[in-house]
């Protein structure tokens, strides 16, 4: 569909949506959504989602139904001599994940305490708020991406108004492997921050009330303060 001012022009992939609600109600729904999310695509059903990717609905369903085969496992050497497992999406899956990352996930809010995977972010910037503090504590989240579940992704990123359960399920299915975020997928970093937003905000508020500085860079949580940090362990 194309939106110019208060005029909505529907395309062939919007046919089922328009038929279900009628042209006037469908246009009002689109304009209502666009007024709140001007930079995000309106995706109500599978046909619109396929059109968003520039593929057929049949091809979209095929990718989702065979998602395990759309990833190749690779191994990245680590400094300690061990290897990190990565799951690299196929070219055709990347054609779907790219627009999800650039057009949808980039518009969703993340916590101010999350410092990774954003424009201008770096480990150095993550460390800056902690400089000069007497006490420093670093905690690591084990199996960070693998611990973020299908349900968490669906609820945090794709469970919004005018996104049907069908589309939410399809988007989540494209972004997950084995019911979790695959490390190596282009959408996993952004999704991890989106899913962790509530956690980061809760921990951040708790720390602020106790004069503790908190930041999270991917799976590394850093706490610092001029006071003892014993309470962090208990939390």
Over which residues does each language-model region extend?
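Non-catalytic, polymerase-adjacent accessory regions of viral genome-replication enzymes
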Residues: 1-72
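N-terminal low-complexity, intrinsically disordered segments
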Residues: 43-58, 102-104, 108-109, 152-157
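Reverse-transcriptase-like RNA-dependent polymerase core
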Residues: 60-79, 162, 166-172
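Short amphipathic beta-strand starts and helix->beta connectors
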Residues: 70-71, 121-123, 206-210
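Active-site-proximal segment of RNA-dependent polymerases
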Residues: 93-138, 143
